[in-house]
Regions:
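Nucleotidyl polymerases of mobile genetic elements and RNA viruses
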Residues: 1-153
Length: 153
């Protein structure tokens, strides 16, 4: 239920160039845009650097305090934030290997694999980083007409 509510508001919060996990957006557009930028810079002999970032173990590495601060920054209400906090407080897990379960251990970061809420929480956290990149005047994009391609997600 919470995932469905979050899914509905994401298109209003997440920048249009973030195509993953946002309804009515297609990640193929981002791939096409990357090729278009590369072709443009090659044809105009424009020097530049294209950086591709792949978050290693992305869902496992998201710090909860950062996630909660992102929810606050995007003006989610206290009730919604408290629901999310409830999902990520005092979580324990174990590892099953060859049918044998390990002792339980406390989790301290990450969003749950397979949980429908997880991709939405993750892209909210990534959007916060993306906003910082877009607003940083020292990070330049490639100017194509009146548009600057600075960040493609």
């Amino acid at each position: 239920m919470i995932a469905l509510r979050l899914k509905k508001v994401l298109p209003n919060i997440i920048h249009h160039n973030q195509t993953g996990y946002v309804e009515d957006r297609y990640i193929g557009e981002t791939i096409r845009s990357i090729f278009d930028v590369m072709e443009f810079t090659d044809s105009k002999n424009i020097p530049g650097i294209l950086i591709f970032i792949d978050f290693k173990k992305a869902f496992d590495s998201l710090e909860w305090h950062y996630l909660f601060s992102c929810l606050e920054a995007f003006n989610f209400g206290p009730n919604f934030i408290n629901w999310v906090k409830m999902f990520y407080t005092n979580i324990q897990s174990c590892v099953i290997n060859n049918g044998m379960a390990s002792d339980y251990f406390t989790l301290e970061r990450g969003v749950r694999q397979g949980d429908p809420l997880s991709p939405y929480l993750f892209i909210l956290a990534v959007e916060s980083l993306a906003i910082s990149i877009r607003q940083n005047v020292d990070i330049k994009g490639i100017k194509i007409g009146n548009h600057e391609a600075k960040l493609l997600q």
